[in-house]
């Protein structure tokens, strides 16, 4: 057993070392808050001096949002078998409204805990979970509605601003006006604004009290657009060590949250390893695991099995649950004439259960019971779109919009319990129908954050659906979607590997950033301006480092111009030394400046008179 456990830990440690090197040209910094234990991580990109030819000025570092946790900090020693430091434990405990349990509440969790066959894969550094005291509500929404600004709220306010107040270069602050479609975009994010947005339900701060390792992050259309990356093992592919690696890899490249969609062996144990080593919010779809417990027979599912699964996962520290409570019995026939029917796994499970029993969805009928569980651990609802369109032909149909209306009804119930709630959206939608989705969601769901899978704007590009969906994601992000669920090149084809995860995240970081630019989010253009200046001044290393993927940028440049001298060249391999448009522009500027100098000298030689008599 010890040998097996050691092998797993060693494998995970080796994997972590391959993905934890510092991001080129950057260093981890921590911006202090109002208390010593509130240190907000960011990434500072150092820039070189502008060459003398272009004025010879210093270029201040650029601060950017960072999701990578301690993994990219060379000063931190990573031990995956111990997990990350419990950053928020003191904040949770000092509120005095939770208690440490004497044992696990879930019967399934207790069975796994005492099964010796699982010793080889069990996370070794486990601690007992916390739960709200009797009668208490421990959600960030509950605190916000009572006028309390929590350390988590201050943390995200500092994080969202990205040290914008420290920028002194007016050129970097230059920005086109945005079109926010009614959003309340602020010039500076304050803790009070964060509190107010959470209290209104327009933003969520997913932070389970049993995930103290997480660095607080906010999701809402008045904040930076966030992205989610999916990972998870299946019955036929992928193991625990690989999933931990994918977690670290996903957050390295910019995943704001990660959903563990495991459906295969050791779901419970895999999730524990992931949560204990995750600085970002973790989401799940509990119905997947509940289905495993009944050997994949949807009709055998019961409320009791599902309830036990919710408690099991809440006590592990899952931050948000996708719950398909809007798939109602009366909506199922509306999908019969669709081209692709019901494509959501969770949606199809609940539809099958409804038809098998000819009863209403038990997630819907027990929704208030679910709320009681959510508010005892501060788990955020992600109300699932189980009837989302699976092709553009099915977009915006009666089934999809009927479910959306029900999700609006459920949102109001969740808010009655002060449970944080976001709404999941499509799917496959052609570009001309995207805004209708956003407008209807805002109207039906009271501006609760929208969380969309793309949408994919065409169905003809298997192998390239990270592109087809990033197009729709950029658009719907501009219109108001708060978080975008990434799509990888393997969508519809297979389980993504590490490179697929990277490609999907990059496509979605581009989409999210484009949306922030279009909305006019303050400071969104700073990085663009800094990179453009570096590009014009042929500061190649700065160009690489300011990019979303510095390693890829350098790799592509060095394929054709690999020598160190080429990092100082005033051209690239695209146009060569004689046809570089930026070099030509600089030559024109120099010519114009020299011409102006000659005219100035002639003016002074003529007596410096404005007018001359003929």
UniProtKB/Swiss-Prot annotation:
Q: Which residues bind Zn(2+)?
A: 428, 492
Which keywords are on file for this protein?
4Fe-4S, Iron, Iron-sulfur, Lyase, Metal-binding, S-adenosyl-L-methionine, Thiamine biosynthesis, Zinc
Which intervals of the chain are annotated as region Disordered?
1-36
- Pfam families on file: ThiC-associated, ThiC_Rad_SAM
Q: Which InterPro entries match?
A: ThiC (IPR037509), ThiC-associated_dom (IPR025747), ThiC/Bza_core_dom (IPR038521), ThiC/BzaA/B (IPR002817)
| GO CC annotations on file | cytosol
- What residues does substrate bind to? 230, 259, 288, 324, 344-346, 385-388, 424, 451
Q: In which pathway does it act?
A: Cofactor biosynthesis; thiamine diphosphate biosynthesis
Q: Where is the composition biased (Low complexity)?
A: 1-16
Q: Which GO terms describe its molecular function?
A: 4 iron, 4 sulfur cluster binding; carbon-carbon lyase activity; zinc ion binding
Question: What top-level class of enzyme does the UniProt entry assign?
Answer: lyase
Catalytic activity of the protein: 5-amino-1-(5-phospho-beta-D-ribosyl)imidazole + S-adenosyl-L-methionine = 4-amino-2-methyl-5-(phosphooxymethyl)pyrimidine + CO + 5'-deoxyadenosine + formate + L-methionine + 3 H(+)
According to the record, cofactor stoichiometry and binding are noted as: Binds 1 [4Fe-4S] cluster per subunit. The cluster is coordinated with 3 cysteines and an exchangeable S-adenosyl-L-methionine.
The Gene Ontology biological process annotation of the record reads: thiamine biosynthetic process; thiamine diphosphate biosynthetic process
Q: Which cofactor does it need?
A: [4Fe-4S] cluster
Q: What is its EC number?
A: 4.1.99.17
Query: Could you say which residues bind [4Fe-4S] cluster here?
Result: 572, 575, 580
Superkingdom of origin organism:
Bacteria
Its quaternary organisation is:
Homodimer.
Q: According to its UniProt record, which protein family does this protein belong to?
A: Belongs to the ThiC family.
Protein function: Catalyzes the synthesis of the hydroxymethylpyrimidine phosphate (HMP-P) moiety of thiamine from aminoimidazole ribotide (AIR) in a radical S-adenosyl-L-methionine (SAM)-dependent reaction.
Name the record gives this protein: Phosphomethylpyrimidine synthase
Q: Which organism is it from?
A: Stenotrophomonas maltophilia (strain R551-3)
């Amino acid at each position: 057993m010890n040998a097996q456990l050691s092998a797993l830990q060693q494998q995970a440690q080796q994997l972590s070392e391959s993905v934890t090197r510092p991001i080129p040209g950057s260093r981890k910094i921590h911006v202090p808050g109002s208390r010593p234990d509130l240190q907000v991580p960011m990434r500072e990109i150092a820039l070189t001096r502008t060459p003398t030819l272009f004025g010879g000025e210093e270029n201040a570092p650029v601060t950017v949002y960072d999701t990578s946790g301690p993994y990219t900090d060379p000063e931190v020693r990573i031990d995956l078998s111990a997990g990350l430091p419990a950053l928020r434990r003191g904040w949770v405990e000092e509120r005095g409204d939770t208690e440490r349990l004497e044992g696990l509440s879930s019967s399934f969790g207790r069975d796994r805990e005492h099964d010796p066959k699982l010793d080889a894969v069990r996370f070794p550094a486990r601690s007992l979970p916390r739960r709200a005291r009797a009668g208490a509500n421990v959600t960030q929404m509950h605190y916000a509605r009572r006028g309390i600004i929590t350390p988590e709220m201050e943390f995200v306010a500092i994080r969202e601003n990205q040290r914008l107040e420290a920028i002194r270069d007016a050129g970097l602050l230059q920005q086109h006006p945005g079109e926010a479609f009614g959003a309340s975009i602020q010039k500076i994010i304050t803790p009070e604004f964060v509190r107010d947005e959470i209290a209104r339900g327009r933003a969520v701060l997913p932070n389970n009290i049993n995930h103290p390792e997480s660095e607080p992050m906010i999701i809402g259309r008045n904040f930076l657009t966030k992205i989610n990356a999916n990972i998870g093992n299946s019955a036929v592919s992928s193991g625990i060590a690989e999933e931990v690696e994918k977690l670290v890899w996903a957050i390295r490249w910019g995943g704001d949250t990660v959903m563990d969609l495991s459906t295969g062996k050791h779901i419970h144990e895999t999730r524990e390893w992931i949560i204990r080593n995750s600085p970002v919010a973790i989401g799940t779809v509990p119905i997947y695991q509940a289905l495993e417990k009944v050997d994949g027979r949807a009709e055998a599912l019961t409320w009791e099995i599902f309830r036990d699964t919710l408690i099991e996962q809440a006590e592990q520290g899952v931050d948000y649950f996708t719950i398909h409570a809007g798939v109602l019995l009366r909506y199922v026939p509306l999908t019969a004439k669709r081209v692709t029917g019901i494509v959501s796994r969770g949606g199809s499970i609940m539809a099958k259960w409804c038809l098998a029993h000819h009863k209403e969805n038990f997630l819907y009928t027990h929704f208030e019971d679910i709320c009681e569980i959510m508010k005892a651990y501060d788990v955020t609802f992600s109300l699932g779109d189980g009837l989302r369109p699976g092709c553009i032909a099915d977009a915006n149909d009666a089934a999809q919009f009927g479910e959306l209306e029900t999700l609006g009804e459920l949102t109001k119930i969740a808010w009655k319990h002060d449970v944080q709630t976001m709404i999941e959206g499509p799917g496959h939608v052609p570009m001309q129908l995207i805004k209708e989705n956003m407008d209807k969601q805002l109207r039906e769901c009271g501006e609760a954050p929208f969380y969309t899978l793309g949408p994919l704007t065409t169905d003809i590009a298997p192998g390239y659906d990270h592109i087809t969906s990033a197009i729709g994601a950029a658009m719907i992000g501009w219109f108001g979607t708060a978080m975008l669920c990434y799509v990888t090149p393997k969508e519809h084809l297979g389980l993504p590997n590490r490179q697929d995860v990277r490609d999907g995240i990059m496509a979605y970081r581009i989409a999210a950033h484009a949306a922030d630019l279009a909305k006019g989010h303050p400071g969104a253009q700073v990085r663009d301006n800094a990179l453009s200046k570096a590009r014009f001044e042929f500061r190649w290393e700065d160009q690489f480092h300011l990019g979303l993927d510095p390693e890829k940028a350098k790799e592509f440049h060095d394929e054709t111009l690999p020598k160190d001298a080429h990092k100082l060249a005033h051209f690239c391999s695209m146009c060569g030394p004689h046809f570089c448009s930026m070099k030509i522009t600089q030559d024109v500027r120099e010519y114009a400046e020299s011409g102006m100098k000659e005219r100035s000298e002639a003016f002074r030689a003529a007596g410096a008179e404005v007018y001359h008599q003929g």
